[in-house]
From Swiss-Prot:
InterPro entries: Jacalin-like_lectin_dom. It comes from the Eukaryota. Belongs to the jacalin lectin family. One of its GO terms (molecular function) is IgA binding. This is Agglutinin alpha-1 chain. N-acetyl-galactosamine and D-galactose specific lectin. Binds the Tn-antigen structure GalNAc-alpha-1-O-Ser, the T-antigen structure Gal-beta1-3-GalNAc and IgA. It comes from Morus nigra. The keyword Ribosomal protein does not apply. PROSITE patterns: JACALIN_LECTIN. Keywords: IgA-binding protein, Lectin. The keyword Transmembrane does not apply. Tetramer of four alpha chains associated with two or four beta chains. Residues 1-30 form the Jacalin-type lectin domain.
Amino acid sequence: GVAFDDGSYTGIREINFEYNRETAIGGXQV
């Protein structure tokens, strides 16, 4: 199961999304 409560899990998801998006832009990938 998920080891985080909804708040922490959502926060981590948001951080990962931002990181992946910035990485994609930095790598010139759309």
